[in-house]
Amino acid sequence: MVRTKANYVPGAYRKAVASQAPRKVLGSSTFVTNSSSSSRKAENKYAGGNPVCVRPTPKWQKGIGEFFRLSPKESKKENQAPEEAGTSGLGKAKRKACPLQPDHRDDENE
């Protein structure tokens, strides 16, 4: 919209009107006729991103719901010895926990 002096209001800002940039035409007028048919094809075709390929789930694979429904008895079956769950099986020797004795020598110097 173009403002004239007749509708000028002091202190009002100018309104910017957005418009589209001109598009490059790679061919002649045939581009215009083909654009309508290509837009119909684009509706049926996947537009981009990661395509999804749905495959059947193998019989041996557990469903996601199985992990949420496990009772405490069933969860112990997977980890027979929970204290050795992080070991690789190379060092099976049991270690005793030896708590450190408090060091009172530092207290005497202060």
Swiss-Prot record:
Give the keywords, sorted. Answer: Acetylation, Cytoplasm, DNA damage, DNA repair, Isopeptide bond, Nucleus, Phosphoprotein, Ubl conjugation
- For this chain, the site of the Glycyl lysine isopeptide (Lys-Gly) (interchain with G-Cter in ubiquitin) cross-link is K15, K24
Q: What is its main location?
A: nucleus
GO CC, alphabetical: centrosome; nucleus; perinuclear region of cytoplasm
Q: Where is this motif: D-box?
A: 23-34
Q: Spans of biased composition, class Basic and acidic residues?
A: 71-80
Q: Which Pfam families match?
A: PAF
**Where does this chain carry the motif PIP-box?**
61-71
Report the record's Gene Ontology biological process terms.
Answer: centrosome cycle; DNA damage response; DNA replication; regulation of cell cycle; response to UV; translesion synthesis
Q: Where is the short sequence motif Initiation motif located?
A: 84-96
Q: Does the keyword Electron transport apply?
A: no
State what this protein does. Answer: PCNA-binding protein that acts as a regulator of DNA repair during DNA replication. Following DNA damage, the interaction with PCNA is disrupted, facilitating the interaction between monoubiquitinated PCNA and the translesion DNA synthesis DNA polymerase eta (POLH) at stalled replisomes, facilitating the bypass of replication-fork-blocking lesions. Also acts as a regulator of centrosome number.
Q: What is known of its domains?
A: The PIP-box mediates the interaction with PCNA. The KEN box is required for the association with the APC/C complex.
Q: How does it assemble?
A: Interacts (when monoubiquitinated at Lys-15 and Lys-24) with PCNA. Interacts with isoform 2/p33ING1b of ING1. Interacts with BRCA1.
Question: Under which name does UniProt file this protein?
Answer: PCNA-associated factor
The scientific name of the source species is: Mus musculus
Instruction: Tell me the lineage of the source organism.
Output: Eukaryota, Metazoa, Chordata, Craniata, Vertebrata
Give the encoding gene's name: Pclaf
